[in-house]
Amino acid sequence: KRIQLLLRIPNLPDDDCPEGFSEDCNIVLRMEGYKRSDYEGKEFKPHWEIGKELGIFDAERAAKLSGAMFALLRGDGARLHRALIQFALSINSEQNEEILPPHFVRPDMMMGTGTLPKFEADAYKFRDDDLWAIPTGEVPLTNLHAHEILSMDELPKRYMAYTVCFRREAG
């Protein structure tokens, strides 16, 4: 019971972290690669509209297959998705070891990252197995060395992964 109570204590923010209750309270610390003036005063379409116009997103068939809030990429959209994954992994491969982790983990791995119990309602659990579908690649990556003591000369560990993320959320 004590462990269950301790798991519900949130992480405390750093004292330098600004207080805020909405996105309007966010503070921009720095901007890289573009000037705000390049984008101010211009209208932009949401990505789902652009994707539909280009014929690379098919929200109707995705909804037919799985319900609302799912994606189906076609043709160039599917190829673009694959290319972006390959690009991201490739540009980071010199500094990081690529890992292809399991998509399902034990409950203690979900607890080790703070996913359980806090986000239990947003997570998918297998009915007949004591396994959870990973909500993000961070869960298996941060637990690669769970219950181990690493020496300083083994650090830092730098990992990267592309994974499917299973979680109930919309927006």
Where are these regions (language model features)?
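N-terminal alpha-helical targeting/anchoring segments
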Residues: 1-37, 52, 56
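TRNA-recognition modules of translation machinery and tRNA-sensing kinases, especially anticodon-binding
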Residues: 30-171
